Design a protein with these regions (language model features):
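Phosphate/diphosphate ligand-binding glycine-rich loop within oxidoreductases
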Residues: 12-129
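Short amphipathic alpha-helix with an adjacent loop that forms part of the alpha/beta core around
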Residues: 189-193
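Short acidic-hydrophobic, aromatic-tinged amphipathic segments that line or gate anion-handling sites
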Residues: 184-188
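Glycine-rich adenosine-cofactor-binding loop
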Residues: 22, 114, 134-154
Length: 201
């Protein structure tokens, strides 16, 4: 009789283990995306979704190194906090002030980088209708991903970047930390739907 149960992946000591850490994590499409490419290229690997609360992030990163993970991606709300937990940070992550990828070095040290800026701006460049001269850009939020987007837009030559966050102090800190000179903050309460549509990119 045909096996009614799906065949499970058989893991071995050679299986490459990676994942994504977030809180919550149910929204992440990363496991499906990475799983697709692992399967397509017949890579002996597995990619987990890992639900980790902010107060357990340090333990989690130490744990993945001990368990033989190759590395992890980071999503909300860990990108900024993970900076202080990495042993090494590359220049891109330092400038953005957040990491979205942590790899485990052969010596067990944690190395942080950030690919959000590159991924975001490359997607815009692939849109034939987009140019940096279209007008002001509006960023909602001031977390790790917003930092990367702000840096990418500034480097691309966008004339003005307007950062809107529930707490204005955090938006101002983003500008100071990333040293972006063409960015301003606006109050969340002062922005209407019409305003956002007018500046949509």
């Amino acid at each position: 009789a045909a096996n009614r149960f799906p065949q499970r992946m058989i893991l071995s000591h050679r299986t490459k283990i990676a994942g994504v850490i977030g809180w919550p994590i149910s929204h992440s499409k990363s496991p499906k995306v990475h799983g697709f490419w692992l399967n397509k290229y017949k890579i002996d690997g597995i990619y987990h979704a890992l639900s980790v609360s902010p107060n357990r992030l340090s333990q989690a990163l130490k744990g993945i190194a001990a368990l033989g993970f190759r590395g992890v991606n980071l999503t909300i709300p860990h990108k900024v906090e993970a900076m202080a937990l990495c042993d090494k940070i590359d220049e891109t992550a330092k400038r953005i002030g957040a990491v979205n990828t942590v790899t485990i070095c052969k010596d067990g040290l944690l190395s942080g980088t950030n690919s959000d800026a590159y991924g975001f701006i490359e997607n815009l460049y692939n849109q034939s209708s987009w140019t940096a001269s279209l007008g002001p850009a509006v960023i909602l939020g001031a977390g790790g991903a917003a930092r990367a987007v702000a840096v990418a837009l500034s480097d691309a030559g966008v004339g003005q970047i307007r950062i809107i966050n529930r707490t204005r102090e955090r938006a101002e800190a983003l500008i100071v930390d990333t040293k972006i000179k063409n960015a301003v903050t606006e109050s969340w309460k002062s922005v209407s739907y019409t305003h956002l549509r007018a500046h949509e990119t």
